[in-house]
Curated annotation (Swiss-Prot):
Keywords: Initiation factor, Protein biosynthesis. It comes from Pyrococcus abyssi (strain GE5 / Orsay). One of its GO terms (molecular function) is guanyl-nucleotide exchange factor activity. NCBIfam families: PRK08335.1. InterPro entries: eIF2B_alpha/beta/delta, IF-2B-related, IF_2B-like_C, M1Pi_N, NagB/RpiA_transferase-like. Catalyzes the exchange of initiation factor 2-bound GDP for GTP. Complex of two different subunits. It holds the Pfam family IF-2B. The lineage of its organism: Archaea, Methanobacteriati, Methanobacteriota, Thermococci, Thermococcales. This is Putative translation initiation factor eIF-2B subunit 2-like. The keyword Zinc does not apply. PANTHER family: TRANSLATION INITIATION FACTOR EIF-2B SUBUNIT ALPHA. Belongs to the eIF-2B alpha/beta/delta subunits family. The keyword Protein biosynthesis applies.
Amino acid sequence: MLPDRVLEILNEMKAERIRGATWLARKGAEAFLALAEELDEALLEDAIRELRSRIIEVNPSMASLYNLARFMPITNNRELVKMRALEFLRRMDEAKRELASIGAQLIDDGDVIITHSFSSSVLEIFKVAKDRRKSFKVIITESSPDYEGLHLANELENLGIEFEVITDSQMGLFCRKATISMVGADMVTRDGFVVNKAGTYLLALACHESDVPFYVAAETYKFHPTVKSNEVVLHERDFSRSGFRVRNVLFDLTPWKFIRGIITELGIVIPPRDIQ
């Protein structure tokens, strides 16, 4: 049985609707830290096995959780568990800094960037670009039904970055006004497909039709080492409007052929050629 504090973190992860793979991975690492702090060493090994499994089950579409679970050793050494969890968090922070610096190089003065949903990695790119005194505008889809785009709008407003919010149904129309597109990712599959908030594939198609370069920002811990696109399970959440059931598949798959490049902390990789 996992300690109450660990169960609280798992429930918080399951309930989250806005923040994505990065936030969930951080919370997952915190769960391992809490486990090491609260459980006797005699019980630790079995508890780690259970937590590794339950972390992945929070959202199997997020490779960050799978890679976190793989990173954590099955051991009864509390200090080793703490050390590995802190090391994972350190690598996450370092990866985000490097990714943001690389991604900001793609933004030129006067660019109009269209994005979908909320990605902390894309937000970091925007922050670095602004710090480098680049002038640009962001077009944000509202990203219904959870409206993650409005969360991004709040962040950009606080940063003083110009933006406008559009309904999801207008992404094809407004894509014509964009010069570049950047989105995040919850998983990059072994064969180079991107799993992200439903609607990402539609934006990629619109960008392809309008000749707008479509980039994905994803640290390498979001790359799944084994899962291919035909093995991804796209989960659906209950949703209704005016008494009618509305289909609400959370994620979609964007084929690599529509992706100009994936921005990582190691550089820009071209799928599927550069994905190992």
